[in-house]
From Swiss-Prot:
Protein name according to UniProt: Elongation factor 4
HAMAP family (UniProt xref): LepA
EC number from the UniProt entry: 3.6.5.n1
Family: Belongs to the TRAFAC class translation factor GTPase superfamily. Classic translation factor GTPase family. LepA subfamily.
Subcellular localization(s) per the UniProt record: Cell membrane
Length: 605
C-alpha cells in the first residue's frame, strides 16, 4: 500500500448526503446524478435506483439510507471520487438521516421550487448544522409551471438564513443543473480528514444479513486502512474477525484491494452472529487498536409500542428471526417476548412512529413471509406509585390498579405545522380536539404560516397526520420533537367481549375522552365481528364501571320450520330448547376477533 498515493487520492474524495422533505424529488435528483456521471448504464436505469426495496418504489418514499460511489471528471480535468449517501425524508426516519450525515462532510439541501420550505426541511437543516456540514441549497423542479423561484429564494434567506444566491436551480426530471451541483460539491465540500497511518477507525452506519456472507456492515473509514486478511476488532462487544472482502457500492457491491480514510464501503468477515454488529460501533485493528471508539450516533429511543403476534401460531420463531434480522440495520427497533390470552405468543415492539411501525410490519410480511396482527399502539407513560417510585409503562395491561397510583405522566411533543393561511382555523380545531395547546403562530409569507403546538404524543400517533393532510387538502407539513412529560388524568379502559376482557384491546385513555372513545370502539367492533349462534355483548369499562355497550344479535335458526299443523305446545318446547342451548353456548362460546377489527379500531380513533 503506497501511503503517498492514498493521501493524494484522499484529497479528491467528496462525501455528501442529499437531504429533503418527503416528496421534494430527492431520489429523482440522485437518479440524474448517477445517470449523468455514468455510474449507472442508461439501459439498466430505473426510477429511484437507490431505493432498493420494492416497498420504497411503491410508496415513492425512501426508507433506508443507501450509499453509492461516483467517479466524476470535473471541469478542472481532475477525477473525483464522490460518495453519495441517500437519506429518507419522513419524520419517522430522521434517525436514518442523522446516521447518513455522520458519514459526510457536506449536504445537498433539496427544496421543491413549487412547495417551498416545509417542516422536515427545517429539521434536516438543523441536523446538518449540528454535524458541521457544508450546505449546498438546490431548488428542484424548476421546470414545473407552478415553480416560484423568487419566493422560495426569499424563504431560504428569511427562514434558513442561507444566502439565496448560493441556491442552484435544477430539475431531477430533465437533469438541468446537475453539472452545477457536481462542480459545487468539488469546490465547496472539503475532502475528508483522516490519517491512513493511524490505527484503523471505521464507523458502522448500516448493516444487513446475507445468507452466504453473513452479516455485512456498511462502513465509513475515518482513520487507518483495512484490507482482506486483516484481523479486526468490534470495539463495543470486543469480537474479533478476519476480513474476507472489502469493497464499495456502485450501487451493487464491487470488491476493492483496500479501503482508506474517506472511503464509504462494506466489509465481510463471515460474521454469523447478528448481535456482534451494531450500528454506530467502531471497527479497529486487533493488532494495533485505536485508543477510543468514534462518537457514533445519538441513540434513538422508541416512542411508539405495540404487540406483534403471528397470525399462524407456529410462525413465532420465524417472527423472532425476522425481527432480529431487521434490527441489524435498524438499531431503533426494540422488541421483547410477551403473551396475550387472546392472541397467544408474540412480541412487544418499539418504533419511532406509526409509519415506522407500518413499514416494519410490511417488511416482515414481504421479506420473511410472516403475517402479523398488531395491537393498538401505545406510548411510554411514567406512573408514580404511592411510595413515589416511577414505573415505566408501555403496555396498558401492565398499568397498576388505580388505588396504587399517585399520578400518571404522559409524553408531550412540540409540533411544527406549516400550512397555507386559509387552513389555520381547521388546523387549530383539530389540534385543540387532540388536547393541544397553541404555542406560537408565525407568518412565513403572505400565503403560509408556521404553527407550533404542544400536543400529547398519544393523541398524535393514531390518525392526527392523516386528518391534518385531509383537512388541508395535502398542503400541510408536520414535524415534531419530543418535549417533556406532564401530569394527565389518565386511566385504563378495558374492552369486554361476551363478558371476557380482551387484553389486546385494552388502552390508556384521558378521562374526559373515555366515553366517546369507548363508544366508538364498541360500535366499530360491532360492525366487524361476525354474528354467532348466541348474543355477544361488547362493553367498554373503566374499572368495574361499564361506560359503553353494543350488542351483536344472535343468528336465528328457525327450529319450528319442520313443524306442520298448529301444535303450539310442540312449538314452545322447541323454542325453549333452543333458548337453553343458546344460553349454554354463550357461557362456553369463544369469540374470535378478526384482524380487520383491530385495524378498524386503529383508524377509528
Amino acid at each position: 500500500m503506497n501511503i503517498t498515493k492514498i493521501k493524494e487520492r484522499q484529497k479528491r474524495i467528496r462525501n455528501f448526503s442529499i437531504i429533503a422533505h418527503i416528496d421534494h424529488g430527492k431520489s429523482t435528483l440522485a437518479d440524474r446524478i448517477l445517470e449523468i456521471t455514468g455510474t449507472i448504464d442508461k439501459r439498466v436505469m430505473q426510477t429511484q435506483i437507490l431505493d432498493s426495496m420494492d416497498l420504497e418504489r411503491e410508496r415513492g418514499i425512501t426508507i433506508k439510507l443507501n450509499a453509492v460511489q461516483i467517479l466524476y471528471q470535473a471541469q478542472n480535468k481532475q477525477q473525483y471520487i464522490m460518495h453519495l449517501i441517500d437519506t429518507p425524508g419522513h419524520v419517522d426516519f430522521s434517525y436514518e438521516v442523522s446516521r447518513s450525515l455522520a458519514a459526510c462532510e457536506g449536504a445537498i439541501l433539496v427544496i421543491d421550487a413549487a412547495q417551498g420550505i416545509q417542516s422536515q426541511t427545517l429539521a434536516n437543516v438543523y441536523l446538518a448544522i449540528e454535524n458541521n456540514l457544508t450546505i449546498i441549497p438546490v431548488l428542484n423542479k424548476v421546470d414545473l409551471p407552478s415553480a416560484d423561484v423568487p419566493r422560495v429564494k426569499g424563504e431560504i434567506k428569511d427562514i434558513l438564513n442561507i444566502d439565496p444566491e448560493m441556491a442552484i436551480s435544477a430539475s431531477g426530471k430533465t437533469g438541468a443543473g446537475v453539472i452545477d451541483i457536481l462542480e459545487r460539491i468539488v469546490t465547496q465540500i472539503s475532502p475528508p480528514k483522516g490519517d491512513p497511518e493511524a490505527p484503523l477507525q471505521a464507523l458502522i452506519f448500516d448493516s444487513y444479513f446475507d445468507p452466504y456472507k453473513g452479516v455485512v456492515p456498511s462502513i465509513r473509514i475515518i482513520n487507518g486502512t483495512v484490507k482482506k486478511g486483516d484481523q479486526i476488532l468490534f470495539m463495543a462487544g470486543k469480537h474479533v474477525y478476519e476480513v474476507v472482502e472489502v469493497g464499495v457500492y456502485n450501487p451493487k457491491q464491487i470488491s476493492k484491494d483496500y479501503l482508506a480514510p474517506g472511503d464509504v464501503g462494506y466489509l465481510t468477515a463471515a460474521i454469523k452472529s447478528i448481535n456482534h454488529v451494531s450500528v454506530g460501533d467502531t471497527i479497529t485493528s486487533n493488532h494495533k487498536p485505536a485508543i477510543q471508539p468514534l462518537p457514533g450516533y445519538k441513540k434513538m429511543n422508541s416512542v411508539v409500542f405495540c404487540g406483534l403476534y403471528p397470525i399462524e401460531i407456529n410462525k413465532y420463531e420465524a417472527l423472532k428471526e425476522a425481527l432480529e434480522k431487521l434490527k441489524l440495520s435498524d438499531s431503533s427497533l426494540v422488541f421483547e417476548p410477551e403473551s396475550s390470552s387472546a392472541l397467544g405468543l408474540g412480541f412487544r415492539t418499539g418504533f419511532l412512529g406509526l409509519l415506522h411501525m407500518e413499514i416494519i410490519q410490511e417488511r416482515i410480511s414481504r421479506e420473511f413471509g410472516v403475517e402479523v396482527i398488531t395491537t393498538a399502539p401505545s406510548v411510554i407513560y411514567h406512573v408514580y406509585n404511592l411510595k413515589g417510585e416511577k414505573i415505566l409503562v408501555d403496555n396498558p395491561s401492565k398499568l397498576p390498579s388505580p388505588q396504587m397510583i399517585e399520578r400518571i405522566e404522559e409524553p408531550f411533543i412540540k409540533a411544527t405545522i406549516i400550512c397555507p393561511e386559509i387552513y389555520i382555523g381547521k388546523v387549530m380545531e383539530l389540534s385543540q380536539n387532540k388536547r393541544g395547546s397553541l404555542q406560537n403562530i408565525e407568518y412565513i409569507d403572505q400565503q403560509r404560516t408556521k404553527i407550533n403546538y404542544l400536543l400529547p404524543f398519544s393523541e398524535t400517533i393514531y390518525n392526527y397526520f392523516d386528518k391534518l393532510k385531509s383537512l388541508t387538502k395535502g398542503y400541510a407539513s408536520f414535524d415534531y420533537e419530543m418535549e417533556n412529560y406532564r401530569v394527565s388524568k389518565l386511566q385504563k379502559m378495558d374492552i369486554l367481549l361476551n363478558g371476557e376482557v380482551v387484553d389486546a384491546l385494552s388502552l390508556i385513555v384521558h378521562k374526559d375522552f373515555a366515553y366517546s372513545r369507548g363508544k366508538t370502539i364498541c360500535e366499530t367492533l360491532k360492525s366487524f365481528i361476525p354474528k354467532q349462534m348466541f348474543e355477544i355483548p361488547i362493553q367498554a369499562a373503566l374499572g368495574k364501571k361499564i361506560i359503553a355497550r353494543e350488542t351483536i344479535k344472535a343468528m336465528r335458526k328457525d327450529v319450528t320450520a319442520k313443524l306442520y299443523g298448529g301444535d303450539v305446545t310442540r312449538k314452545k318446547k322447541l323454542l325453549e330448547k333452543q333458548k337453553k342451548g343458546k344460553k349454554k353456548m354463550k357461557t362456553l362460546g369463544k369469540v374470535d376477533l378478526p384482524q380487520k377489527a383491530f385495524l378498524a379500531i386503529l383508524s377509528a380513533k
